[in-house]
Every structure is written in structure tokens, then in C-alpha cells.
From Swiss-Prot:
Record region (Fusion peptide): 58-78
Source organism phylogeny: Viruses, Riboviria, Pararnavirae, Artverviricota, Revtraviricetes
Keyword terms, alphabetized: Cleavage on pair of basic residues, Coiled coil, Disulfide bond, Fusion of virus membrane with host cell membrane, Fusion of virus membrane with host membrane, Glycoprotein, Host cell membrane, Host membrane, Host-virus interaction, Lipoprotein, Membrane, Palmitate, Transmembrane, Transmembrane helix, Viral attachment to host cell, Viral envelope protein, Viral penetration into host cytoplasm, Virion, Virus entry into host cell
Top-rank lineage group of the source organism: Viruses
Protein name: Envelope glycoprotein gp95
The gene coding this protein: env
InterPro entries: RSV_p95_env, TLV/ENV_coat_polyprotein
Family listed: Belongs to the Alpharetroviruses envelope glycoprotein family.
Residue segments, region Immunosuppression: 114-130
Length: 246
């Protein structure tokens, strides 16, 4: 609440409810995605130790899990997606390694072919013959696609690196929300969020716990009172014959 609600630098002239349309929200999101700076996320690449054993559920298991335990079905789907990503990364790494070895072999074969052709030309000239004396020796075409292969090879490596694991989801969300903040600010905000979550849990759960404790205490008191009352009744019932005999 400002110190000067009427007049002054903190004057509240008119209060209105903010109720933007769905199209307005989409326009703002599109403009922010176009003009905003892309922040670096805390992702780590999948290593060779990840599990790539994909075991998909059958139709019966999927139906029963979706009806009886949707959370288990969602967790299973996420786990299989992670394993599929690991399998894709390993396959891409093997493919790039294989193509790299094949490229090295092709390069060495090219050098060997050029050396053999130079040796043949030298021997023909040494014996006084030209290329026209042997059919097909005057025209020699050896295509060179090494530059294109290297570019595509590099693109494959870059695509493999696009698959990663977000190791700090909250930190990435805070960096995207507040812009270019430092790591110390991210850790501070994470600590504040954790403290806020703990306080909210205490606020939500503490009344329930207190109510349960009060209910148990009230029940114990009522039980003790009822036991005491029954004891008095039994004592009175046992004391009446004795008084008659006296």
C-alpha cells in the first residue's frame, strides 16, 4: 500500500482487473520468443553408461496401467523415452564412428590411386609411349566429395549433441524467467523457493497435525473419564451389599 494513495509519485489512479484474451497472450509469447535472448540451459549430454534396453509394454499392460495407475504408466513412458534417447545417441555415435573410419579408408585409397596413376604415367613416358597407346588412360576422373562429407559428418555430430538431460530444471526456469542472472543469484533464488515450499507445507500440514493430536488427546481424555465413571459405578455396586449386611 503506498504512503500517499491520493496524489504523489505512488498515486493509484484507477484499479482494473487484468483479463487479457487468449490471442493477446499468444501474441506476447510469440514476440518474446522472437526478440528474447536465448538462455543457456543446464543440460548434460548422455554418456555411454546410460541404459538403452527398451522394453515396451503390451496393449493389455498399457490399458490396465492407464486405468488403475496413471502415474505408473506415465513414469514408465518417461523411462522408455529416456532409454530410446540413449539408444538413439549410441546408434548415432556408432554411425558417425563408422563413417569416419570409411572416410579415412576412402582418403587412403584416393592417395594410392593417384600414386599408381603417377607411376603408370612415368613408366609410359620412360618407354616412349603416350596415354593414347593404352585405351582409357588419357581420361582419368576421380571425384572429390571429401568437403561435403566432412560437413555432413559434422552435422551428424551436432545433431547427436542436441539430445541431453536437463540436470537443473529449476535453475533453467529461473534463468529463463529473470534473464541473465549469475549463478549465485540462481542458488539464492532456489534456496528461497525451497524455504517457501517448506513454509507452505508446514502451513498446510500443521493444522491437520494439530487437529489429529487434539482429537487423539480428546479421545484419551474421554476414555479415561468413561473408565473412571465405570469404575465408580462398579465400586458403588460392590459397596451396596456390604452396607445392607452391616
Amino acid at each position: 500500500i503506498p504512503s500517499r494513495p491520493v496524489g504523489g509519485p505512488c498515486y493509484l489512479g484507477k484499479l482494473t482487473m487484468l483479463a487479457p484474451k487468449h490471442t493477446d497472450i499468444l501474441k506476447v509469447l510469440v514476440n518474446s520468443s522472437r526478440t528474447g535472448i536465448r538462455r543457456k540451459r543446464s543440460t548434460s549430454h548422455l554418456d555411454d553408461t546410460c541404459s538403452d534396453e527398451v522394453q515396451l509394454w503390451g496393449p493389455t499392460a498399457r490399458i490396465f496401467a492407464s486405468i488403475l495407475a496413471p502415474g505408473v504408466a506415465a513414469a514408465q513412458a518417461l523411462r522408455e523415452i529416456e532409454r530410446l534417447a540413449c539408444w538413439s545417441v549410441k546408434q548415432a555415435n556408432l554411425t558417425t564412428s563408422l563413417l569416419g573410419d570409411l572416410l579415412d579408408d576412402v582418403t587412403s585409397i584416393r592417395h594410392a590411386v593417384l600414386q599408381n596413376r603417377a607411376a603408370i604415367d612415368f613408366l609410359l613416358l620412360a618407354h616412349g609411349h603416350g596415354c593414347e597407346d593404352v585405351a582409357g588412360m588419357c581420361c582419368f576422373n576421380l571425384s572429390d566429395q571429401s568437403e561435403s562429407i566432412q560437413k555432413k559428418f559434422q552435422l551428424m555430430k551436432e545433431h547427436v549433441n542436441k539430445i541431453g538431460v536437463d540436470s537443473d530444471l529449476i535453475g533453467s526456469w529461473l534463468r529463463g524467467l529473470f534473464g541473465g542472472i549469475g549463478e549465485w543469484a540462481v542458488h539464492l533464488l532456489k534456496g528461497l523457493l525451497l524455504g517457501l515450499v517448506v513454509i507452505l507445507l508446514l502451513v498446510v500440514c500443521l493444522p491437520c497435525l494439530l487437529q489429529m493430536l487434539c482429537g487423539n488427546r480428546r479421545k484419551m481424555i474421554n476414555n479415561s473419564i468413561s473408565y473412571h465413571t465405570e469404575y465408580k459405578k462398579l465400586q458403588k455396586a460392590c459397596g451396596q451389599p456390604e452396607s445392607r449386611i452391616v
